[in-house]
Amino acid sequence: MAVFTAVSDADLALWMRHYDLGDVVAFRGIPSGIENSNFFLTTTHGEYVLTIFENLTAGQLPFYIDLMSHLAKHGVPVPAPVARDDGTLFGELHGKPAAIVTKLEGAAELAPGIEHCVEVGQMLARMHLAGRDYPQHQPNLRSLPWWRDAVPAIVPFITGEQRALLEGELAHQAAFFASDDYAALPEGPCHCDLFRDNALFAHAAPDTGHSVRLGGFFDFYFAGCDKWLFDVAVTVNDWCVDLSTGALDAGRADALLRAYQTVRPFTTGERRHWGDMLRAGAYRFWVSRLYDFHLPRAAQMLKPHDPGHFERILRERIAHAGALPETHACN
């Protein structure tokens, strides 16, 4: 969530004419992230987030916006898109699609503990099940076809050793994706980017017995229909990792995965290919971070992520595959 497209006070005043949200009290850009232009918007009616979509088209956007509405209606805490005066959920700002959504309660937890991982695991499983009857389909746009396109553009900027790893893992994942086992894995709408900065936590009520409460998941604009296990792997690779080495923290990983499977038990096929999917989750973000680092787009507040972080994670997952916690598996 960076700022690629500037919005002046005059721009905002014209845009807000299409909403019944009262008067603007405060408006500022959000400097984190790398994909869209995002702004905190406070009005006399409440707190919101304005997003200008830098890459998604108006034809692609309904999948994401409608998915958030669908999940919210099924009790999953996500930002709710705000309707414009004509009933639509997004419009056009500076020639690009744009939308306003409600702002979730809480703050990001950048040093998550066991309790945070339990909350995330349970809600991720609930989100997957809630999306089963979502009628629209949009593939994960940062999956194998995109990797195949991006890798040749990255190769000139990296070392021979990195190239060997990048191309070798691409071949491994291509074979995995082509397998009957992969085709049989459960699938549906996935967040595909559920990092620790894409969830918020608030203080739990005193009578709950918990110290934290999940405020919700946000930034669904990398979402797509994919294998649920991929979504779990992406989440574990961020929430349950030692940031200095890339190794999994066994306690946090076990907590998140056990919490997930209390809601949706893993299948036998998912257990068999957990290691492959952990590698896929690491590879996806190594490729995208290499691409964004070496082939950046102009942005007023862009802060590119370190590609080396996910290179370390990928090497760790290749060396230490790990296993899902033991419990009864579905077929």
Curated annotation (Swiss-Prot):
Pathway: Amino-acid biosynthesis; L-threonine biosynthesis; L-threonine from L-aspartate: step 4/5. SUPFAM superfamilies: Protein kinase-like (PK-like). Its EC number is 2.7.1.39. Gene3D superfamilies: 3.90.1200.10, Phosphorylase Kinase, domain 1. CDD domains: HomoserineK_II. GO terms for molecular function: ATP binding; homoserine kinase activity. It holds the Pfam family APH. Keywords: Amino-acid biosynthesis, ATP-binding, Kinase, Nucleotide-binding, Threonine biosynthesis, Transferase. GO terms for biological process: threonine biosynthetic process. The keyword NAD does not apply. It catalyses: L-homoserine + ATP = O-phospho-L-homoserine + ADP + H(+). The keyword Ligase does not apply. NCBIfam families: PRK05231.1, thrB_alt. PANTHER family: AMINOGLYCOSIDE PHOSPHOTRANSFERASE DOMAIN-CONTAINING PROTEIN, AMINOGLYCOSIDE PHOSPHOTRANSFERASE DOMAIN-CONTAINING PROTEIN-RELATED. Belongs to the pseudomonas-type ThrB family. This is Homoserine kinase. It comes from Burkholderia thailandensis (strain ATCC 700388 / DSM 13276 / CCUG 48851 / CIP 106301 / E264).
